[in-house]
Structure formats: C-alpha cells, structure tokens
Amino acid sequence: MTSLFAQEIRLSKRHEEIVSQRLMLLQQMENKLGDQHTEKASQLQTVETAFKRNLSLLKDIEAAEKSLQTRIHPLPRPEVVSLETRYWASVEEYIPKWEQFLLGRAPYPFAVENQNEAENTIQNEAQR
C-alpha cells in the first residue's frame, strides 16, 4: 500500500509539473502571438507609409514631367493654331474629291485654274 501511495504522490507531482509546464508554454505562445500581431501591425504601418510616400513621389514626378513638357513643347502661337485649323478644314473638304480620284471614279480633282486660286489664297494669307 505504501508503494501505491508513493506512486500516487510521484504521479501527482509529475502531473503538477506537466500542468505548470503546459501553462508556461501557453503563456509563451500567447506572448509570441502578441509579438507577431505587434510586428504585423508595425509592418502594415510601414507599408502604408511607403505607399503614401511612393504616391507622393509619383505625383511629384508627374508634375515635373508636365512642367518639362511645357518647356520643351510650348503651346503654339495663335497664328499657327489658326493655320493648322484651316489646313485640317481644307483637308476634310477635299477628302471626298481625292477619294473618288484615288478609287478611279473621277478625274484629277484640281484644274490649273484651281491651282492659281490656291496660290493667290496662300499669297493673300502670307501678306496678312
């Protein structure tokens, strides 16, 4: 009976050791999990800060690019814009005539007298 009692005491102590070790391991796991959450939150904050910084840098680069573009290619003068507008209007006006000529359905779209008119118009525009 004493051997059973001694064995019971030994098993009880072993049980207490296992339970205390289990509690210690659970506490370590909780601490580790808390540290991981803290680290993850810190990483998330770092990522958000980097994203905002990158977005700001991108906006600055785009603004600098736009500024350089306007320096390299300034807006054309009003006379140039006017000439360009009239040129494209003329192109659109004569496209149907040229289209028929190129398809072989009509003669050459400009006669000699039309060429003289065009030259006179160009000279008049140049004198303005």
UniProtKB/Swiss-Prot annotation:
<keyword id="KW-0966">Cell projection</keyword>
<comment type="function">
    <text>May play a role in ciliary assembly.</text>
</comment>
<dbReference type="GO" id="GO:0005929">
    <property type="term" value="C:cilium"/>
</dbReference>
<protein>
    <recommendedName>
        <fullName>Centrosomal protein 15</fullName>
    </recommendedName>
</protein>
<dbReference type="Pfam" id="PF15134">
    <property type="entry name" value="CEP15-like"/>
</dbReference>
<dbReference type="InterPro" id="IPR028006">
    <property type="entry name" value="CEP15-like"/>
</dbReference>
